[in-house]
Amino acid sequence: MKRLVCLVLVLVLAGCGAAGEETLSTASALTVECLTEEQDFGGFTASPIADGESAELLVRAVLARYPTGFADQWGRGQILLVSDLRGTDRFTGGDYAGFTQRVGDGWRMVLDGDRLTAGTIHHEIAHILDGLLTEAGVLTEADWMALCPGGFSYGPEQTLYPDFFVDEYAMTDIREDRARTFEEAIRRGPGAYADAPALWLKLEYFSRAIRTHFDTTLWPEKTVWELGLE
C-alpha cells in the first residue's frame, strides 16, 4: 500500500475522464479515470491531476503484461489517477504513491500519477489479488507464516532477514510482504529469486494460490510474475 508505496467481465480501459464519486460505475469493466476535484478517501486525501495522459499510458502498458482476461476476473474496478496523494489519520508521515480500497462489491486503486512507476502498479495489483485470494480461502496467514523465520512477527524497526524478505518494508505487514515479493519478482524478471530459496517459496505459494483461484484457460505457461520462479 505505501509505496514511492468474481465474475468474468469484459476489460474496458476507458480514457482518463471525470471521477471522484464514492461509488463505482455499474458497467462491468475496469476503468481508468482522473480525479477532477479534491477528495478525502478516508485515510488518504488527493488533488486533481492536471495531465494524466502519461500515467494512463503506463497503466495500460503494465496491464498488458498480465494474462489475457486476468483483470476481467477481479470484479468491477476503477483505477483513479490523482495528484498530491497524502496520508491522514494513521497514515500520516508517509510518502504514498498509491493504495487500494474496497468500494461496495468492487475495488478502487488510487495512484499518484505525478510519481507513478510500473512497480507501484504491480504492487497495488498484488494487494487486489491478496484480498481476493484471502477471501476465497486459498491464501492463509498460517501457510504464509510457515515461510517466514521461526518466531517472526511483522512490525516496524526490525533487523532485516535478507534471505526471507525483499526489504525492511516487507517486514512491516504480511500484505506488504506479499506485495513486495510479487512486485520485485516482476521487476527482476527471470530467475528473480534463484539465489533466495525462502523468497522463491513465497512467490511459488502466492503464484500457486493465484492459479488455484482464477480461470487460467487463456494463460501462458509462465506469467510475468512466474518468470521469477525460473
Predicted regions and their residues:
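Positively charged n-region of N-terminal signal peptides that target proteins for export
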Residues: 1-4
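Acidic/histidine-rich, surface-exposed loop or edge segments in extracytoplasmic proteins
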Residues: 32-50, 162
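Zn2+-dependent metallopeptidase catalytic core
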Residues: 50-77
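Ser/Thr/Pro/Gly-rich low-complexity linker/stalk segments immediately outside membranes or between
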Residues: 22-27
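Active-site-flanking segments in enzyme catalytic domains
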Residues: 74-230
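Bacterial signal peptide processing site
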Residues: 17-19
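C-terminal motif of bacterial Sec signal peptides marking the signal peptidase cleavage site
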Residues: 12-15
